[in-house]
């Protein structure tokens, strides 16, 4: 899973595992250590920002915003149904929700964190069964936004970040005290 996140392997459900590039063992170990240290901090930042974004989106969204959110959910569902991880649909969903919040400062913060968020996205969605769970989590957020319920949208976003945070790399750290 970690090698997929690093772009070394490509896993295609039902098709196999493909080598994308050769790994430098020293680089891989160092990157794994850095990632394990960095992920909790990224997830804390995501929770602080994305919970507020979901709440604002529920208050400010338009029908066009809901169309974009629904299209992102459909895209992720199609990717997952095709045996993919749903990376593009996931990214599109978060961008649509951020846009619906109508706050250029928060949009800028999300843009600044984009590379780090991509790291957590790939780590999370590469976990077995995770794409379907993430899609269901996104649907809960979208439902609350559609209802115009900021408190429910915030709770759903917080649950989503908790789901994203449950990754093997961090579980390994807590089990082994590394």
Per-region residue spans from a language model:
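Short, conserved micro-motifs enriched in small and acidic residues
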Residues: 40, 44, 84, 128
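Short coil/turn segments at secondary-structure junctions
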Residues: 30-37, 77, 81, 125
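Short linear motifs at protein or domain termini
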Residues: 1-48, 55, 173-178
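Juxtamembrane/interface motifs at transmembrane-helix termini
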Residues: 4, 86-90, 126-131, 171-178
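C-terminal effector-binding regulatory domain of bacterial HTH transcription factors
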Residues: 150-178
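Conserved amphipathic alpha-helical segments that form helical-bundle/coiled-coil interaction surfaces
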Residues: 45-123, 133-140, 152-163
């Amino acid at each position: 899973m970690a090698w997929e996140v690093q772009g070394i392997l490509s896993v295609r459900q039902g098709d196999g595992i493909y080598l994308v590039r050769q790994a430098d063992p020293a680089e891989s170990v160092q990157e794994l250590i850095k990632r394990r240290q960095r992920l909790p901090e990224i997830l804390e930042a995501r929770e602080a920002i994305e919970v507020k974004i979901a709440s604002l989106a529920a208050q400010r969204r338009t029908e066009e915003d809901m169309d974009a959110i629904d299209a992102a959910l459909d895209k992720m569902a199609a990717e997952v149904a095709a045996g993919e991880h749903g990376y593009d649909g996931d990214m599109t969903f978060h961008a649509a929700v951020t846009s619906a919040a109508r706050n250029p400062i928060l949009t800028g913060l999300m843009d600044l964190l984009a590379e780090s968020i991509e790291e957590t996205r790939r780590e999370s969605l590469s976990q077995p069964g995770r794409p379907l769970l993430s899609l269901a989590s996104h649907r809960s957020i979208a439902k609350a936004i559609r209802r115009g319920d900021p408190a429910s949208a915030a709770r759903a976003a917080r649950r989503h970040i908790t789901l994203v945070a449950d990754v093997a790399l961090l579980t390994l750290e807590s089990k082994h005290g590394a």
